[in-house]
Amino acid sequence: MRYKLKEIFELQMGKTPSRHNSSYWNTGDYKWISIADLSNVGKYISETKETISESAVIESGIKIIPANTVVMSFKLSIGKTAITAEDMYSNEAIMAFHDKKIVELLPEYIYYLFKFKDWNVGSNKAVMGKTLNKATLAEMEIEIHTIEEQKEIIKVLDQISNIIAN
């Protein structure tokens, strides 16, 4: 069955705390995802180049991305996708997809679906590259298979990924 992303997910954009406040950055408190972090990661993201402090979270109002949430870049490098291995935060070029529990979904299935989707359809050409906005992304449709089919798709694609990696 086909669904618009907004029907099955709560879409959450990240945020960048002020770079002018050095106490916000690289304290080791909380991992903060940027596009660069998604460039060379596998299915799960567990490490980030930068971290933010608790005061950065509180004072900037940035929202947490819970563990096992699919995240995807949607500005400049569209479609770089991963699943959070733990609670994290992200910048505004990363969208987190919180499952609304409308239909049975496995994060690994969504990961592969997003990874192989042609995101150029509906993207706008920006000065430095392509970009999607939240409204356009929310209207995009994806095919959701039954939970049994999702498990089979994940199994096959995991096997292929392992063969390619080795």
Task: For every predicted segment, state its role.
Residues R2-V41, I58-S60:
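Low-complexity, Lys/Gly-biased intrinsically disordered segments
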